[in-house]
């Protein structure tokens, strides 16, 4: 088997492949609603004890975000108390419970197929449980990979988590399309005509009564696989040292790095870890500010305004088949995520973030000045795609890399939790504000604002974010002690 300085590359790769399944589930769970929401809307419009308004539909479509915020906020406490590995096992169990419960919210208690307010509440509880799993995985998966990877390839390996997120979103788009098949056209037609009851005996009826259940239920396959496989990987060496299990830590390090390198890395870890945890501001305020602002900028640059509403945007531009453009954009996103994976250790984190910020600014400003001009709709489409792919080789993967490695060992669990919680909060702010802002202020104002934020993000990275390329996680403790 191929080795890395006496360690097993195959062993390291197998660990990372299992860990990034958490990223795939992150993408899968957040995107599955895109195909299911029309059928779900039509199903609950058949309720007789309440009116399924736009408010209820908006809440149901985004209820998982509540769980994401809760899960990310709890991730630090759990990652410290239970460990990185057991926290990921818990996330896998939550993904599975959510998929099963969302598929069959009646769960042998409520009448099957009878839409009412109680069923809607139960369905949203299951979606929130899945969101908690997403929140835990979004914080702990990159942390786990960052703590187990050798420093020379850490950025590349953590970047695979972002690839898995985008791949999970792409997979569920195809799964949803496969499940709906020929049912999709009559479904959209029925919902679009303001249908208030289930239409029996039509293709739309199957999608309304059953199709959305299959979509949510399909997540049980990767969720079950992740929950089982994560039990087979080791705990991270950094966490093992923090809880006094030096021998176990050395064995894990030896299998990854070889015996000689393992002893050196273990000694370095022990020099910077004198206790399990320290107070969050032990290394000064700037350490936390940098991590939190990385998360805030990743969302404030407005990427989810494109990822969540791409079909709406392309349709507003005047394109006939917005779904095809959305899928094409998704394939491009996957390809440009690979750019980051294979260049992050050569070019460094900061150059990619700055280049991506400027590319996004150019794309956003391009959209601002071409949107709604029929003669320039092709240029507008190119601008949207430039905006999107610039994120995919920069802020998409690199933000996760930096959050996983910029904090010192003894505060990483709590600090990552704070940073990722801010990420989900701003995800919600951007996602819920885009449509009202675009409708009231116009697309020119909205995308000009995103462009300005992108420029501010580039300045922030240039001036305040440390370059972590080639540095060990223990170097971060020494760096922030000097900066304090």
Which role does the model predict for each range below?
Residues 262-271:
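Short, well-structured alpha-helical segments
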Residues 1-248, 254, 271-484:
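Alpha-helical transmembrane bundle of multi-pass membrane proteins
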Residues 256-258:
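Short helix/loop segments within enzyme catalytic domains
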């Amino acid at each position: 088997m191929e080795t890395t300085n006496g360690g097993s590359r195959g062993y390291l790769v197998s660990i990372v492949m299992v860990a990034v399944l958490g990223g795939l589930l992150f993408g899968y769970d957040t995107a599955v609603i895109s195909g299911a929401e029309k059928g779900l809307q039509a199903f609950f419009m058949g309720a007789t004890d309440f009116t399924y308004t736009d408010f209820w539909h908006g809440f149901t479509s985004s209820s998982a975000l509540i769980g994401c915020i809760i899960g990310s906020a709890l991730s630090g406490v759990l990652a410290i108390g239970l460990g990185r590995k057991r926290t990921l096992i818990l996330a896998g169990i939550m993904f599975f419970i959510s998929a099963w419960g969302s598929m069959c919210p009646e769960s042998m208690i409520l009448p099957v197929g009878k839409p009412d307010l109680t069923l809607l509440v139960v369905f949203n509880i299951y979606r929130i449980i899945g969101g908690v799993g997403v929140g835990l995985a979004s914080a702990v998966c990159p942390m786990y990979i960052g703590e187990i990877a050798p420093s020379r390839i850490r950025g590349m390996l953590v970047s695979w988590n972002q690839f898995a997120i985008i791949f999970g979103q792409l997979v569920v788009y195809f799964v949803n399309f496969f499940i709906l098949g020929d049912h999709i056209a009559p479904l959209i037609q029925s919902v679009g005509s303001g249908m208030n009851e289930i239409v029996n005996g039509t293709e739309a009826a199957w999608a309304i009564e059953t199709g959305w259940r299959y979509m949510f239920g399909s997540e049980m396959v990767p969720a079950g696989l992740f929950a089982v496989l994560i039990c087979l990987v080791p705990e991270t060496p950094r966490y093992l040292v923090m809880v006094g299990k030096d021998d176990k830590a050395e064995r894990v390090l030896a299998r990854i790095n070889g015996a000689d390198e393992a002893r050196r890395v273990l000694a370095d870890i022990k020099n910077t870890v004198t206790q399990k945890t320290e107070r969050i501001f032990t290394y000064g305020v700037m350490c936390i500010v940098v991590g939190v602002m990385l998360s805030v900028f990743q969302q404030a640059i407005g990427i989810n305004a494109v990822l969540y509403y791409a079909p709406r945007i392309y349709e507003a531009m005047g394109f006939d088949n917005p779904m095809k453009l959305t899928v094409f954009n998704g394939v491009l996103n996957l390809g440009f995520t690979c750019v980051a994976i294979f260049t992050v250790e050569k070019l460094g984190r900061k150059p990619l973030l700055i280049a991506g910020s400027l590319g996004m600014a150019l794309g956003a400003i391009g959209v601002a000045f071409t949107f709604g001009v029929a003669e320039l709709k092709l240029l507008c489409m190119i601008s949207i795609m430039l905006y999107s792919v610039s994120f995919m080789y920069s802020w998409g993967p690199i933000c996760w890399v930096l959050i996983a490695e910029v904090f010192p060992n003894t505060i990483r669990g709590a600090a990552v939790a704070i940073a990722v919680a801010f990420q989900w909060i701003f995800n919600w702010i951007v996602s819920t504000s885009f449509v009202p802002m675009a409708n009231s202020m116009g697309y020119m104002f909205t995308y000009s604002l995103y462009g300005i934020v992108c420029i501010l993000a580039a300045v922030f990275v240039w001036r305040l974010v440390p370059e972590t390329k080639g540095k060990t996680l223990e170097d971060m403790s020494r760096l922030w002690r000097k900066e304090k």
